[in-house]
């Protein structure tokens, strides 16, 4: 067993079953090891930004990390934009970056670079393995770090000689570091605050927008009438008919300010206070009303789902929310295509429990309006604002949930960044329908 084989077997032992790869010479022993160690599915990507974006989509849908395999510092640099998006989404990823052999670094060959320096802004954990015998334990720690609440990018730098030299054995999975528990005192205090008659908003993010978390939020709304909101680019939300309705915060700062006007208490569940996406002259960046009190039920690293359930119980809320989104399908339009008619077609024809990898950008408003009451679905938006994510996100989502339809509504500009994802979709025979909007907002003329 060499270092690469011990690495792959350790990843498999730790529950990692998919690797999005754009390898080069330094990673060839990893590639060769894929033929001898079973259990890790390699997915070839023609560009590193596709690999990192696909790992994000996979992690958001599967709830567990995929691995990436990137070639040296420049390869990592090519993938940084979508690692930025994944960091903002708190997606678990094991980011394996090959490097020159340890003894070769002293010669400063052309591709030598500061890999850790590239990785630092997007990683929650970084480590350079020192030898083949250390690879397995380092990989187990990387998976543990990626899985640690709320989820993060663990970058493991793999020198070529650590991959090809003999290793002893694979490592087993380390215990997960789960979310911190919200104290009973915090639950009690917030239950009292929610009974004070003030105009209250609850801002949800993360697992509070899916499954049991969303249901618990609905119970609280049924009891107190609290307004349920989510971030503009909440990374993973369950939306549509039969679901608890949650309002999405709009994009522009002045719209956010108008939406929140009069709010006296804002309760955060895995979220941060809303701010303007960009700064504009004479426009506020901070969108929370001046006299609004900010209250944290759960920080991102804390168990927001259990906190919501405990808060619902403390309030004496009903066991189920009485408010559900009704199904409303718009029918098929006639006439020419525009952002509204395309949104109507998508909402009408997409089946139940589809996954939307959404980078429709400037065409998004009609689509979000149509999807709000469409068939139940999962919505994965551009979580970090760096365009060129939608197509790779769809690749990862389709591999994580092969039994579900994936739809990728995408602006033309961002799609041009990572169009290589279409090749991976075809090669892997993925069930993805891609709709490219001719937004033409840039209107660049050469």
Regions found by a protein language model. Give the residues of each.
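N-terminal cofactor/phosphate-binding cores enriched in small/glycine residues
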Residues: 2-84, 88-89
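Active-site diphosphate/adenylate-binding microenvironment
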Residues: 4-8, 12-17, 22-25, 30-34, ...
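Structural signature of the thiamine diphosphate
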Residues: 17-18, 60-97, 120-172, 190-200, ...
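Active-site nucleophile and cofactor-binding loops and adjacent substrate-binding regions
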Residues: 21-24, 43-53, 68-75, 130-131, ...
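A glycine-rich helix N-cap at a beta->alpha junction
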Residues: 42-45, 92-96, 118-122, 128-129, ...
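Glycine-rich, anion-gripping cofactor-binding loops and their flanking helix/strand elements
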Residues: 60, 206-297, 374-404, 416-420
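Thiamine diphosphate
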Residues: 96, 104-113, 223, 366-445
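Phosphate/pyrophosphate-binding active-site segments
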Residues: 133, 157, 169, 270-364, ...
């Amino acid at each position: 067993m060499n270092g690469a084989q011990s690495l792959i077997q350790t990843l498999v032992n730790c529950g990692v079953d998919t690797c999005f790869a754009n390898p080069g010479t330094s990673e060839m022993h990893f590639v060769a090891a894929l033929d001898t160690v079973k259990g890790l599915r390699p997915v070839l990507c023609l560009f590193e930004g596709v690999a990192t974006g696909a790992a994000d989509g996979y992690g958001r849908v599967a709830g567990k990390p995929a691995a990436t395999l990137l070639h040296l510092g420049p390869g990592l640099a090519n993938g940084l934009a979508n690692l930025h998006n994944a960091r903002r989404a708190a997606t678990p990823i094991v980011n394996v970056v090959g490097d020159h052999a340890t003894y070769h670094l002293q010669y400063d060959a052309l591709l030598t670079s500061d890999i850790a320096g590239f990785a630092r802004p997007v990683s929650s954990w970084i480590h350079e393995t020192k030898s083949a015998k250390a690879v397995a334990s380092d990989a187990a720690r990387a998976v543990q770090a990626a899985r640690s609440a709320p989820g993060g990018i663990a970058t493991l730098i793999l020198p070529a000689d650590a991959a090809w030299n003999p290793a002893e054995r694979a490592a087993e999975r380390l215990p997960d570091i789960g979310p911190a528990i919200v104290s009973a005192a915090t639950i009690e205090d917030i239950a009292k605050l929610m009974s004070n008659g003030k105009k209250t908003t609850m801002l949800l993010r993360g697992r509070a927008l899916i499954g049991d978390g969303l249901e618990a939020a609905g119970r609280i709304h049924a009891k107190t009438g609290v307004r349920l909101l989510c971030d503009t680019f909440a990374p993973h939300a369950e939306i549509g008919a039969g679901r608890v309705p949650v309002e999405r915060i709009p994009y522009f700062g002045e719209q956010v300010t108008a939406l929140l006007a009069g709010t006296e208490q804002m309760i955060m569940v895995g979220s941060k206070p809303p701010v303007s996406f960009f700064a504009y002259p004479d426009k506020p960046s901070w969108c929370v009303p001046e006299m609004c009190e900010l209250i944290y039920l759960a920080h991102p690293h804390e168990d927001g789902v259990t906190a919501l359930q405990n808060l619902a119980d403390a309030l004496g809320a009903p066991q189920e929310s009485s408010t559900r989104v009704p199904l409303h399908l718009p029918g098929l339009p006639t006439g020419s295509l525009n952002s509204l008619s395309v949104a109507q077609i998508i909402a009408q024809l997409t089946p139940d429990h589809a996954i939307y990898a959404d980078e429709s950008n400037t065409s998004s408003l009609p689509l979000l309006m149509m999807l709000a009451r469409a068939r139940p679905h999962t919505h994965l938006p551009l979580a970090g604002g760096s365009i060129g994510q939608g197509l790779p996100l769809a690749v990862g989502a389709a591999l994580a949930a092969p039994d579900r339809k994936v739809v990728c509504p995408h602006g033309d500009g961002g799609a041009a960044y990572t169009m290589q994802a279409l090749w991976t979709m075809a090669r892997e025979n993925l069930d993805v329908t891609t709709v490219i909007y001719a937004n033409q907002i840039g209107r660049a003329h050469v």
